[in-house]
C-alpha cells in the first residue's frame, strides 16, 4: 500500500499528496488514519490527487497519513445483504452485527455490452390495476414516479416491493438517496411488518450526510442489484430520490473546481446521470427494473435535472394531488401517465384498445365537468349522462386497497392479475355493469368483487 498525506481541506473536498511513482488512479478509495474513506476524483499533477470525503471531514488536519487501498470502494453483494440496512460503504447501520458476505464488488463498473443486453418487451405484472392498464412496466424498464409531498410515492414503492417479493418471489434493492432519516426508518418498519424484509436490501445515504455519500449511495445500491441480476434473477431497484443524486453532484462539482453550467448544475450532469442509468439494464441472464421517485423543483419540468432524467425513462407514473383529495388511492393520474409499452405490438390489441377507451371516457368526463358544475347533470344529453356514469365507475375502479396500507384502511390488500384488470374495464366500457351503483366499484380488487359488493348493498 502506498501512503500519502493531506495537503488541503475544503469542506468535503480533500487534496492528498503522494510520491510521484505511486499516484492513485481516479476512483481509487483512500483510507485516512482516522478511519475516513476518500474517493479520488482528479489528478492535479505533482503527485497531488483531489478526493471527495465519504463521511464528515470534521477533525481532519493537514499532514495526516492517507493510505491507498489500490481498489475502488468495495461493497458486500449477494443474499447476505437482504434484510439489512447499509451505508454507502456497505457497512451495516442496523445494529444487527456483521453482514458476513462471501463477496465484495467495486461500485464503479462498466455497463453491460451490446451483446449481453436483451431487449425488454416482456411486461412485469405489478398487480396494481391502474399501472398494469395505463402505464405498464417492462421487465428491465425504467419508471419515473413523479409526485409532490404526501400523495403516495413511498406507499406505491412499498406495495411494488411487496407484490414482487410475494407474487414473483423477486428481490428488491432500495437506495435512499438524500432521504429523510425518519422516512428511512418508517420504510424499514413497514417492510418488517409486511414480512418482506428478507427480500429487500436497504442502502441509505440520508439528507444529513456529506455530499460524497449521497452521490455514491445510488451506485452502492445498483451494484447489489447487478449481483442479483447476474445470478439470473429479476430485480427491482428503487431510488428515492433521483433528484437528490443530481443535487449531491452539484454540491461537490464547484469544490472540485468545475465551472457550473445552466442553473448552477454541474457541467457533467448528463454524463453522471447516464453512467448510473446505463447500468440499469437487462442482460440475457436477468433483469433490473428500476422505479425512481423524481422530485420536480418548483414544478418546472424543463429544469435540467428532471429533463435529463426524462430522457432515460420508459414509463412515467404521475401521482396527482387532485385525485388523492377524492380519496382515490393509488392517486395515479391516468391521463398524465405514459408508457412506451402501451403499444398494440407489445401489450396486444385488446389491452391497448381498453386502455385508450378508458382514457377517452375520462377525458370526455373532464370536459363535461364544467357544464355539470354550472347546469347540473339534468342538462346533459342521454349519451353524455352514460359517459359520466361510466367514467365515475372507472375512476372508482382504478382505486385499490394496498397490502402495505391495511393498517390504515382496514380493508385487506388485493393483487389483481392483468387478465382480470382488462376484463373488468372492458366490461365497464361495454356497458355490462351500467346497472350497478358506482359505490360498489370503490376500493375493490377484481370485477367479481364489485358484483359481490353490489349484492350486499
Curated annotation (Swiss-Prot):
Family under the similarity heading: Belongs to the ATPase alpha/beta chains family.
Enzyme Commission number(s) of this protein: 7.1.2.2
Sites where the protein binds ATP: 147-154
Keywords carried by this UniProt record: ATP synthesis, ATP-binding, Cell inner membrane, Cell membrane, CF(1), Hydrogen ion transport, Ion transport, Membrane, Nucleotide-binding, Translocase, Transport
CC terms in the record's Gene Ontology section: plasma membrane; proton-transporting ATP synthase complex
Topology class, membrane: Peripheral membrane protein
PROSITE patterns referenced in this protein's UniProt entry, alphabetically: ATPASE_ALPHA_BETA
Catalytic class of the enzyme: translocase
Localisation per UniProt entry: Cell inner membrane
Annotated source species: Haemophilus influenzae (strain ATCC 51907 / DSM 11121 / KW20 / Rd)
GO molecular function terms noted in the UniProt entry: ATP binding; ATP hydrolysis activity; proton-transporting ATP synthase activity, rotational mechanism
Record-linked Gene3D superfamilies: 2.40.10.170, Bovine Mitochondrial F1-atpase, Atp Synthase Beta Chain, Chain D, domain 3, P-loop containing nucleotide triphosphate hydrolases
Superkingdom classification of source: Bacteria
Lineage: Bacteria, Pseudomonadati, Pseudomonadota, Gammaproteobacteria, Pasteurellales
Catalytic reaction list: ATP + H2O + 4 H(+)(in) = ADP + phosphate + 5 H(+)(out)
Stored InterPro entries: AAA+_ATPase (IPR003593), ATP-synt_VA_C (IPR055190), ATP_synth_F1_bsu (IPR005722), ATPase_a/bsu_AS (IPR020003), ATPase_alpha/beta_chains (IPR050053), ATPase_F1/V1/A1_a/bsu_N (IPR004100), ATPase_F1/V1/A1_a/bsu_N_sf (IPR036121), ATPase_F1/V1/A1_a/bsu_nucl-bd (IPR000194)
Protein name per the record: ATP synthase subunit beta
Pfam families: ATP-synt_ab, ATP-synt_ab_N, ATP-synt_VA_C
Assembly and binders: F-type ATPases have 2 components, CF(1) - the catalytic core - and CF(0) - the membrane proton channel. CF(1) has five subunits: alpha(3), beta(3), gamma(1), delta(1), epsilon(1). CF(0) has three main subunits: a(1), b(2) and c(9-12). The alpha and beta chains form an alternating ring which encloses part of the gamma chain. CF(1) is attached to CF(0) by a central stalk formed by the gamma and epsilon chains, while a peripheral stalk is formed by the delta and b chains.
Task performed by this protein: Produces ATP from ADP in the presence of a proton gradient across the membrane. The catalytic sites are hosted primarily by the beta subunits.
Amino acid at each position: 500500500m502506498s501512503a500519502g498525506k493531506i495537503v488541503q481541506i475544503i469542506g468535503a473536498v480533500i487534496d492528498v499528496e503522494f510520491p510521484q511513482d505511486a499516484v492513485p488512479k481516479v476512483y481509487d478509495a483512500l483510507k485516512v488514519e482516522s478511519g475516513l474513506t476518500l474517493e479520488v476524483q482528479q489528478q492535479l499533477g505533482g503527485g497531488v490527487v483531489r478526493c471527495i470525503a465519504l463521511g464528515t471531514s470534521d477533525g481532519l488536519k493537514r499532514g495526516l497519513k492517507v493510505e491507498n487501498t489500490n481498489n475502488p470502494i468495495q461493497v458486500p453483494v449477494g443474499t447476505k445483504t437482504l434484510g439489512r440496512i447499509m451505508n454507502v460503504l456497505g457497512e451495516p447501520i442496523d445494529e444487527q452485527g456483521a453482514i458476513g458476505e462471501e463477496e465484495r464488488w467495486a461500485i464503479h463498473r462498466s455497463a453491460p455490452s451490446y451483446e449481453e443486453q436483451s431487449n425488454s418487451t416482456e411486461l412485469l405484472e405489478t398487480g396494481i390495476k391502474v399501472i398494469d392498464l395505463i402505464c405498464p412496466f417492462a421487465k428491465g424498464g425504467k419508471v419515473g414516479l413523479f409526485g409532490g409531498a404526501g400523495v403516495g410515492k413511498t406507499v406505491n414503492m412499498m406495495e411494488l416491493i411487496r407484490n414482487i417479493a410475494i407474487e414473483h418471489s423477486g428481490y428488491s434493492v432500495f437506495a435512499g438517496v438524500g432521504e429523510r432519516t425518519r422516512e428511512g426508518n418508517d420504510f424499514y418498519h413497514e417492510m418488517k411488518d409486511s414480512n418482506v424484509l428478507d427480500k429487500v436490501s436497504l442502502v441509505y445515504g440520508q439528507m444529513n450526510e456529506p455530499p460524497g455519500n449521497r452521490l455514491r449511495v445510488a451506485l452502492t445500491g445498483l451494484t447489489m442489484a447487478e449481483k442479483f441480476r447476474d445470478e439470473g434473477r429479476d430485480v427491482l431497484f428503487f431510488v428515492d430520490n433521483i433528484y437528490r443524486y443530481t443535487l449531491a453532484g452539484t454540491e461537490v462539482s464547484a469544490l472540485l473546481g468545475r465551472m457550473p453550467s445552466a442553473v448552477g448544475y454541474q457541467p457533467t450532469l448528463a454524463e453522471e446521470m447516464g453512467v448510473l442509468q446505463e447500468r440499469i439494464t437487462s442482460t440475457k441472464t436477468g433483469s433490473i427494473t428500476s422505479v425512481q421517485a423524481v422530485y420536480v423543483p418548483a414544478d418546472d419540468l424543463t429544469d435540467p435535472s428532471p429533463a435529463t432524467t426524462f430522457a432515460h425513462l420508459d414509463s412515467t407514473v404521475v401521482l396527482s394531488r387532485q385525485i388523492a383529495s377524492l380519496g382515490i388511492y393509488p392517486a395515479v393520474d391516468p391521463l398524465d401517465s405514459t408508457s412506451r409499452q402501451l403499444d398494440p405490438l407489445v401489450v396486444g390489441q385488446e389491452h391497448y384498445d381498453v386502455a385508450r377507451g378508458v382514457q377517452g371516457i375520462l377525458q370526455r368526463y373532464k370536459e363535461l365537468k364544467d357544464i355539470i358544475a354550472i347546469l347540473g347533470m339534468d342538462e346533459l344529453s342521454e349519451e353524455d349522462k352514460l359517459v359520466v356514469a361510466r367514467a365515475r365507475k372507472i375512476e372508482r375502479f382504478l382505486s385499490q386497497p394496498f397490502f402495505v396500507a391495511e393498517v390504515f384502511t382496514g380493508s385487506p390488500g388485493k393483487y389483481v392479475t392483468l387478465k382480470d384488470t382488462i376484463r373488468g374495464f372492458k366490461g365497464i366500457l361495454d356497458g355490462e355493469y351500467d346497472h350497478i351503483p358506482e359505490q360498489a366499484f370503490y376500493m375493490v380488487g377484481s370485477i367479481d368483487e364489485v358484483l359481490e359488493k353490489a349484492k350486499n348493498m
